[in-house]
């Protein structure tokens, strides 16, 4: 027997990472009744348990906003949305102080120490480090303290829409054959980044593009997905995040720290042209922000061994299906984190703010951006909801969505979601598809993904609630892959973490712009959103000075 529950509130928050927790807390502070749903466990959701620092901007201790913005604008290759970049910087100290007041302990920072400039030029603060397990506990306790109703281990699968407005969602319990209906005057998607369940990056295992897929299906605009994330992982233990313990073989050959980054053959790795110098006065520090390991694969020279005190062989492609922080997700319809569909908001990695543009511009900015947009979205959604009258959602609208949600478990036969996911991974995984891009290869992959979308996804079947969840995750990942490939084809230039072998140069005349995705008459349509001219770089400055990083083929 299928159990069905209906839960009502003013604001529904989907996702329990730092963005979702901030959204729920701030909505509650506006006296809204808040429901919070997470596929995992609120506080420990998504990538939040893996984040360990937050940037903290404070002019009172010598920070200069123009310096910070100038660095990020150039590092982002001029396609950052400067409104959201500035917002994440200015609100970072407030977020930092708030987390302190909630009991989170940060590691001490010496603002005068040269160590603080390791990841950014002088004048930019070293990010404040903390223990992620402490943050998870503090966030959850604060959400509970605010009176938010938490539902762990529930996957929201489809949004409810009535009279052009999102009015809640339908979800599935992961532990039972239970369908849940959430009625809410405003819904905030905080479901994190996208991924295709890669083996090499555990933070993505539950982040399967659910938010943007649901939003796309109700008509929301989605940000382009061409700027890929380039996290790497260890060869010997792909599922480990970070570089822990040197292998005995490498230690015997090279010692624990040979003092440089090198190939597994022992040849020294020359990073020239594949880095941004961040301490030009010394020339001793640099921050990799591009496709370094993918470009080495392209040249046939992987794996490399990272220069650390615990060297390991590394390969790229760990975060398959993921974009840069804040470089995909729902397109913001305004500065309140609303989407382009009434009643629907987003925050964190689910909101395409482009605060970092085409690269990950500054360590610690991800947490600041997630917390600040969560706070903005929560406040705005609560005010929106409290300004409405009574909300009545028709049974017909609910039942239609429920039938779609349960369709795979009603199928008597079809395709296993695990098998379809493996097909998708095999299609998208090669470095020469997702990272080193060229139109003929992208079109070939897009043809396969379109076939999967049209012929296999409608026939996904599930034998139990666990497999039903997998079916919805697979459907969402396939849709995201189609968006990713079409975005890569659409941007006919190279910039930041988007490298087109057939267009290896930046094209400022045509591509100082963002791409957007929307469903129109059953088709996926991509459009350009021009970047305001006042945010453009000075085009009179020589190309080589505007863009210090060189792509192969330039």
Regions found by a protein language model. Give the residues of each.
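Core beta-strand elements of the Rossmann-like FAD/NAD(P) dinucleotide-binding domain
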Residues: 6-9, 176-186, 340-341
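N-terminal Rossmann-like FAD-binding beta1-loop-alpha1 element of flavoenzymes
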Residues: 11-36
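Glycine-rich FAD pyrophosphate-binding loop
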Residues: 29-49
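Glycine-rich active-site loop/strand segments that organize a redox cofactor
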Residues: 56-88
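Mobile, glycine/GP-rich and aromatic-enriched active-site lid/loop segments adjacent to catalytic centers
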Residues: 93, 100-157, 224-361, 429-554
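Conserved beta-strand-loop-beta-strand element in the redox core of flavoprotein oxidoreductases
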Residues: 160-181, 187
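Glycine-rich loop(s) and the adjacent beta-strand/alpha-helix scaffold that form part
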Residues: 186-240, 360-380
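Long, amphipathic alpha-helical stalk/connector segments used for oligomerization, subunit docking
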Residues: 384-466
């Amino acid at each position: 027997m299928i159990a069905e529950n209906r839960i009502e509130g003013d604001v529904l928050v989907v996702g329990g990472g730092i963005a979702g927790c901030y959204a729920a807390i701030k909505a509650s502070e506006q006296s809204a009744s808040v429901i919070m749903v997470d596929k995992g466990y609120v506080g420990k959701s998504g990538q939040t348990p893996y984040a360990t620092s937050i940037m903290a901007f404070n002019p009172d201790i010598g920070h200069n906003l123009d310096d910070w913005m100038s660095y990020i604008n150039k590092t982002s290759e001029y396609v950052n949305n400067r409104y959201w970049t500035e917002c994440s910087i200015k609100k970072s100290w407030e977020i930092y102080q708030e987390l302190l007041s909630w009991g989170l302990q940060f590691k001490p920072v010496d603002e005068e120490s040269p160590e603080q400039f390791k990841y950014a030029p002088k004048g930019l603060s070293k990010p404040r480090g903390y223990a992620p397990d402490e943050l998870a506990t503090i966030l959850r306790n604060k959400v509970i303290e605010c009176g938010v109703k938490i539902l762990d281990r529930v996957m929201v699968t489809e949004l409810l829409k009535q009279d052009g407005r999102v009015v809640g969602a339908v979800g599935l319990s992961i532990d039972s054959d239970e369908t849940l209906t959430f009625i809410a005057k405003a819904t905030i998607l905080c479901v994190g980044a996208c991924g295709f369940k890669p083996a090499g990056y555990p933070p993505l295992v539950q982040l399967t593009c659910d938010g943007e897929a649901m939003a796309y299906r109700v008509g929301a605009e989605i940000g382009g997905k061409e700027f890929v994330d380039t996290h790497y992982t260890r060869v010997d233990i792909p599922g480990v995040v970070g570089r822990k313990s040197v292998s005995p073989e490498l230690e015997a050959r090279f010692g624990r720290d040979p003092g440089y980054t090198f190939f597994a053959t022992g040849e020294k790795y020359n990073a020239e042209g594949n880095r941004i110098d961040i301490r030009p006065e010394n020339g001793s520090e640099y921050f990799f922000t591009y496709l370094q390991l993918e470009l080495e694969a392209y040249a046939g020279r992987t794996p490399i061994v990272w220069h650390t005190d615990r060297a390991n062989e590394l390969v790229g492609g760990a975060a398959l299906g993921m974009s840069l922080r804040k470089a995909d997700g729902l397109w913001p319809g305004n500065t309140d984190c609303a989407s382009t569909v009434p009643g629907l908001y987003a925050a964190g990695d689910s909101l395409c703010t482009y605060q970092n543009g085409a690269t990950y511009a500054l360590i610690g900015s991800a947490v600041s951006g997630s917390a600040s947009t969560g706070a903005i979205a929560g406040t705005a959604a609560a005010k929106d909801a409290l300004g409405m009258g009574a909300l009545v959602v028709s049974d017909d609208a609910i039942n239609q969505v429920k039938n779609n949600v349960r369709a795979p478990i009603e199928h008597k036969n079809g395709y296993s979601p695990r098998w379809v996911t493996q097909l998708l991974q095999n299609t998208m995984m090669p470095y020469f598809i997702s990272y080193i891009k060229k139109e003929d290869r992208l079109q070939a992959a897009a043809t396969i993904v379109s076939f999967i979308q049209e012929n296999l996804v409608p026939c996904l079947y599930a034998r139990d609630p666990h497999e039903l969840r997998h079916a919805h995750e697979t459907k969402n990942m396939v849709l995201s892959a189609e968006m990713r490939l079409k975005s890569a084809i659409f941007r006919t230039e190279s910039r930041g973490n988007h490298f087109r072998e057939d267009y290896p140069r930046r094209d400022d005349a045509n591509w100082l712009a963002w791409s957007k995705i929307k469903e129109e008459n059953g088709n996926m349509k991509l459009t350009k959103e021009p970047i305001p001219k006042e945010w453009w770089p000075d085009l009179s400055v020589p190309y080589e000075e505007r863009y210090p990083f060189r792509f192969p083929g330039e």
